[in-house]
Amino acid sequence: MATETYAVDAEDVVKQFGKQRALDGVTLRVRRGEVYGLLGPNGAGKTTLIRSLVGLVAPEAGTVSVLGHRMPQLEVLAHVGYMTQQAALYPDLSAEENVHFFGAIYGRVDGVRDALELVDLWDRRKSVVASLSGGMRTRCSLACALVHKPDLLLLDEPTVGVDPQLRVQLWDRFRKMAAEGTTIVVSSHVMDEAERCDRLGLIRFGKLLAEGSVAEIKAKAGVDRLEEAFLKLSEVSPA
């Protein structure tokens, strides 16, 4: 792919569902090799924004470019990994078969073992997904998103149901991937995870209220804790 400055370049994106404006003029630019966190409560617009980046949601207004290409564009998806909030897996297949399926789509079945080992599922690779716990299904879904070693990784609440020890391991891996050039956009409402990001975007009512490093956001709000900064900076009406 080309080497543009931004892996994600979305401008003035608007998305309406009936009378509800899920995205209200969002502009988002994420540099290559950056870990960017979307922080906000449920219903803030995080999932809709991520789905618009991958081309699953068509905005009413605005533009979305990913890896230098205007979305939606099928060829770009070969370079994008996307993990949904709810595991999109085949319940009657094993964990290994699920990851192999997604690897085959991208012609990267050689990455199956690495992906399963990363999420600590190699020992359970023969287990049918329907028999796995919710946390294990989350990990399997993440392995499917990682199997083809994407240039851009879009993660919607990737550590829900994951135990604290594995959460730390996953974030260590995310940081290593970013150091190797992978761009990661991750949504979360967990403050300690937000602290691991290079930059954050605080989102509520479909608006991107503030952006910057954790230190910059705290300074902008004039507080010492990220939770307090989010509460102070999100004191806006939905109108």
At which residue positions do the language-model features occur?
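Helix-to-loop junction immediately C-terminal to a conserved catalytic motif
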Residues: 54
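Catalytic Walker B motif of ABC-type/P-loop ATPase nucleotide-binding domains
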Residues: 153-157
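ABC ATPase "signature
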Residues: 211-212
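Conserved ABC ATPase "signature" region
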Residues: 100, 104-124
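Conserved ABC transporter NBD signature motif
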Residues: 62-76
